[in-house]
Amino acid sequence: TPSRSGSYSISYLTIKSAFEAQTQTINGVEFETSPAFDQFKENIDVISGRLSNSLEASGISDRYDTISQDILVPAFLAAYTGENAENASMGVFPRIPIPNWRIDFAGLSKLPGLKDVFSSVNLTHGYRSIFNVNNYTNSLLYTEKMTLDNQLTDYPLASLTDSITGKLVPVYILNQVSILEQFAPLIGINIKTKTNLSASFNYKRDRNLALNLSNAQVTETQNSGVTFDFGWTKADLLLPFKT
């Protein structure tokens, strides 16, 4: 019996939701909330409705469970990419890689007032976002089109049901999907003076999103950090040590 399993990664773009955290006060206590997560919950009904329409158009009378991965994953991706769930992709495996970037600008040292003091002034900014399906395997109910020449991105609608629940079973079974987003750095400044003093400042930020499909739970962790470095270069410096 043919089967298929593996993992899937693709460069992505989630910058629209990167700075959306808000605060809410309940009984005098301030909590941080996530507009993207609230949107994810709203998207579930939208995606469920779109899938029902697609199933009806295909002549399939059965329905997905509300927390089926075929509903949750598109709702999750639409929320954290800032797309409208009404017209967002319904695929579980995004098809097109989105370019990430790194920008380095070294022109400030040529400006009047700076070029007499600094030999170099560099600004840096980098962005990286990766969508991961940590592990997938085909449902044992499906044996057709499991060969490698069938693209994962051509994700089909479910057509077979679970004998116990009566709900549609997805063609591929996923345990978890995640998004790793990094600003490395969000802003970085590196300078060197004419007197060989050097300094650098970097503000980095990252976010890790995970959707656990066994319990429909979303976890989000964020980290940020600031680094400073200073240095001085001196030619022909004599150290007071004997060798």
Where are the regions that the model predicts?
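Exposed, low-structure sequence patches enriched in small/polar residues
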Residues: 1-243
